[in-house]
């Protein structure tokens, strides 16, 4: 008799739909109180992939009842002009979230621009104040992909207390904030990266593996202990048998017999990223109702006038 528990495919599309439904319900409640959450999306240049990403974000916002504003600037826009636009959006009380679509043209300092967004409107969670707050376990706007990953884990595993989690990758966008969120959820966390020794050995000790390194099929069954839960953040385009396809950082077919739950690529983490952008916009709108004067002070400090 086969007593092995059935493998659980973690459906990111279904989970994202639940998050978006929750957001839409809360947005309706805010609107009933006279508050219309609004997200401003800034796109510099005409990169086709960025245009698709922006359109998807605007569509999800509209579905949730969030007002969306698009600002499209030419690729040769001076950084001072972009900074001036951000300053205007920071000061506009009707705008609750600001997202600057990355990547930016090479002549613009990406970090300087991201730090110009006032922390209470930083729905990407990239501002240093939000990054620091997350590391301290405070309630702040959190990067969308790690927040979505945590929700997938909680929905799949329940209470994460005491679980050993290994995060593969140490990027500012996923790896580091993911580790902070797992610590906040009372996991024991190990972060491994390209310079780590004994990668496979460390990963095989983990109850939870989050792979976020951008290397196609790096992690296979040999990296995973039986019954592990795997969140695959990687999205890599490869050519295989004459066809282009998307694969994750985890070798899905190899890992499948070894794990108790795993996200597919595509259809796993990706939908949750946009869902949590909408959730962050909702949270930002709420935060700004409780700290409007604080918001004004932060906006002035973050975005001084540009002469």
Swiss-Prot record:
InterPro entries, per the entry: Aminoacid_DH-like_N_sf (IPR046346), NAD(P)-bd_dom_sf (IPR036291), THF_DH/CycHdrlase (IPR000672), THF_DH/CycHdrlase_cat_dom (IPR020630), THF_DH/CycHdrlase_CS (IPR020867), THF_DH/CycHdrlase_NAD-bd_dom (IPR020631)
Gene: folD3
Family note: Belongs to the tetrahydrofolate dehydrogenase/cyclohydrolase family.
Function field: Catalyzes the oxidation of 5,10-methylenetetrahydrofolate to 5,10-methenyltetrahydrofolate and then the hydrolysis of 5,10-methenyltetrahydrofolate to 10-formyltetrahydrofolate.
Protein name: Bifunctional protein FolD 3
Species the sequence originates in: Ectopseudomonas mendocina (strain ymp) (Pseudomonas mendocina)
Residues that bind NADP(+): 169-171, 194, 235
Single GO MF descriptor: methenyltetrahydrofolate cyclohydrolase activity
Self-association state and partner proteins as the record states: Homodimer.
Catalysed reaction equations from the record: (6R)-5,10-methylene-5,6,7,8-tetrahydrofolate + NADP(+) = (6R)-5,10-methenyltetrahydrofolate + NADPH; (6R)-5,10-methenyltetrahydrofolate + H2O = (6R)-10-formyltetrahydrofolate + H(+)
Matching PROSITE patterns: THF_DHG_CYH_2
EC nos: 1.5.1.5, 3.5.4.9
Pathway(s) it belongs to: One-carbon metabolism; tetrahydrofolate interconversion
GO cellular component: cytosol
Keywords (A to Z) from UniProt: Amino-acid biosynthesis, Histidine biosynthesis, Hydrolase, Methionine biosynthesis, Multifunctional enzyme, NADP, One-carbon metabolism, Oxidoreductase, Purine biosynthesis
GO biological process, one term: methionine biosynthetic process
